[in-house]
């Protein structure tokens, strides 16, 4: 195969760029959670949560102290009635030392770890909300200046079956469970 002399630098540049692009560390489609010891995933049996998670008195709730992106968080996990993990929230108090740049750094860490692009829903300097959803699993980052910052991993309801069910009901068709 012949390569023109003009194309060679471009090919080398493309190879370098593709080699430098880091693969995502975590898979949101699989519900993987980027925090804590061991790999924790949404949809897993909550009884299998690894240390440092501890069960609380309230059924279906666990707590832990975790770190992510160099930030210390208090974390809580919630399970549904069947004991399946559905939500993990990491939160930290904001003593006034957080700024939009800190929130942006947290969002960038999540984007890099998951290979996603969290979308700003609200970002006005005192309240920021970013979100991303993939295959019924979502990540949200919420910051309220002077109050708290939180990071939530959550299993959500698939919308397509709900839309199909609503369309069938509107058409007067029998809805299949």
Task: List where the protein language model places each region.
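Residue-level detector of functional hotspots within protein domains
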Residues: 6, 25-28, 63, 71-76, ...
């Amino acid at each position: 195969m012949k390569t023109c002399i003009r194309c060679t630098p471009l090919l080398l540049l493309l190879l370098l760029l593709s080699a430098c692009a880091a693969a995502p560390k975590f898979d949101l489609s699989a519900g993987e959670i980027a925090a804590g010891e061991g790999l924790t995933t949404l949809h897993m049996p909550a009884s299998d949560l690894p240390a440092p998670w501890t069960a609380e008195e309230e059924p279906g709730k666990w707590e832990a102290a975790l770190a992510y992106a160099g930030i210390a968080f208090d974390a809580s996990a919630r399970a549904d009635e069947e004991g399946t993990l559905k939500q993990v929230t990491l939160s930290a108090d904001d003593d006034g030392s957080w700024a939009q740049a800190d929130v942006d750094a947290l969002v960038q860490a999540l984007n890099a770890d998951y290979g996603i692009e969290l979308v700003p829903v609200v970002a006005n300097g005192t309240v920021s909300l970013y979100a991303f959803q993939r295959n019924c699993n979502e990540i949200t980052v919420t910051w309220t200046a002077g109050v708290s910052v939180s990071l939530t991993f959550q299993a959500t309801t698939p919308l397509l079956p709900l839309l199909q069910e609503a369309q069938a009901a509107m058409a007067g068709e029998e809805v299949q469970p």
